[in-house]
């Protein structure tokens, strides 16, 4: 199999990268009716598999789970989750031949084996669904020409997909049809019905492409969503402790600081996040973020280049074939870091203190979000896609760190995201560790910025620069569809 994206000519590549249209709510007037009366079989019962299935069943669809025979015989976690929630569970041979839509929600590294196992069992004219297009785009999986291939990609972890649905809402979602596999022209109708069944139509749906989803998703998770948070956590903790801060306080400031800071980002973008700072601190955070962008732009561009070319995917798949040696080594090294092993702080940190004492962290968030967005857009990805894969998902990832530090983040995200995170963080830490971190001033981290005087003209120009960045323009529109999403709890 060959990387699908690399088989396209330049015009086709640019066309696929640039596919992105925000769909009107009137386009979902029929909601999930196109799939009602049809049999949907989900392969895989992890976080996305279970929670999408629960939502789809509650939307009136006929849902069953196909698991490997050994998972059923040994009553593994996937079997327990499906049966405990009252779903029909059977082997591939039992359920796949009956399915009108087979939804593959297994991890990326299992996709080829799963698809090669289920494809011969699928009936003529059935549909195959994904929530991430890596198998199609990067692996280049070939699907039978009578099978329709669609994607519905919620832009949240599976648990959030369920919680927002239970509240009568949903999470922003990307949908797509594989242009090589839409023999009956029904792919978009299937994808729309599936998205509506998960509740995604209530929060906003982008009609995208498999290519645009994969390339933007990989870029976001490697850089700002995971890699920047990991690098920022390790660098900030070590800096605080080296300057005499209590390790327990330093750990809590960072562990819960990302969540607190990005909650403001979620509600009002970079503008609101920066507005939570005093005027002198805002000017300092802006200056730091510009400095960071200058230093880190080549690293962001390298990751985007390697994603576009397929270099990243080929390297990761080589590690799959080598029993994940690199991934497991990097995971072990992360677990041994000082931040991960620091004592817990019993005291309370007020919400505003996270901003006042975390000016560097605010600057890192701003720089990372803007760089990821700018790099994606300059590579042909449309602004709406770039927004969802940079700013939108960041509070959700930060929330995982608040639960159990970097360990929890790396457990919750996919192995693909985790591998990319380590690649980025392992390059970013040495890039910033010496010259940049050594140049920090008192008030950048661990203590509030001293002084109250500001230059009005400078403050005016900085405010205008923040508010006029393209991610703020598109973000204001997209956040208008998400006002009903719940607030992430912020720890004290």
Curated annotation (Swiss-Prot):
Record-linked InterPro entries: 6-PGluconate_DH-like_C_sf (IPR008927), 6PGD_dom2 (IPR013328), KARI (IPR013023), KARI_C (IPR000506), KARI_N (IPR013116), NAD(P)-bd_dom_sf (IPR036291)
Active-site residues, as the UniProt record annotates them: 132
Binding site for substrate: 414
Keywords: Amino-acid biosynthesis, Branched-chain amino acid biosynthesis, Magnesium, Metal-binding, NADP, Oxidoreductase, Repeat
Function: Involved in the biosynthesis of branched-chain amino acids (BCAA). Catalyzes an alkyl-migration followed by a ketol-acid reduction of (S)-2-acetolactate (S2AL) to yield (R)-2,3-dihydroxy-isovalerate. In the isomerase reaction, S2AL is rearranged via a Mg-dependent methyl migration to produce 3-hydroxy-3-methyl-2-ketobutyrate (HMKB). In the reductase reaction, this 2-ketoacid undergoes a metal-dependent reduction by NADPH to yield (R)-2,3-dihydroxy-isovalerate.
Span of domain KARI N-terminal Rossmann: 14-208
Binding site for NADP(+): 45-48, 68, 76, 78, 108-110, 158
Positions annotated to bind Mg(2+) 1: 217, 221
Enzymatic reactions: (2R)-2,3-dihydroxy-3-methylbutanoate + NADP(+) = (2S)-2-acetolactate + NADPH + H(+); (2R,3R)-2,3-dihydroxy-3-methylpentanoate + NADP(+) = (S)-2-ethyl-2-hydroxy-3-oxobutanoate + NADPH + H(+)
Organism: Pectobacterium carotovorum subsp. carotovorum (strain PC1)
Name under which the protein is recorded: Ketol-acid reductoisomerase (NADP(+))
Record EC number: 1.1.1.86
Cystine bridges: none
Domain KARI C-terminal knotted: 209-344, 345-485
Gene3D superfamilies membership: N-(1-d-carboxylethyl)-l-norvaline Dehydrogenase, domain 2, NAD(P)-binding Rossmann-like Domain
Record GO biological process: isoleucine biosynthetic process; L-valine biosynthetic process
GO (cellular component) term, any one: cytosol
Family (UniProt): Belongs to the ketol-acid reductoisomerase family.
Pathway: Amino-acid biosynthesis; L-isoleucine biosynthesis; L-isoleucine from 2-oxobutanoate: step 2/4; Amino-acid biosynthesis; L-valine biosynthesis; L-valine from pyruvate: step 2/4
Residues involved in Mg(2+) 2 binding: 217, 389, 393
Organism taxonomic ancestry: Bacteria, Pseudomonadati, Pseudomonadota, Gammaproteobacteria, Enterobacterales
UniProt cross-references to Pfam families, sorted A to Z: KARI_C, KARI_N
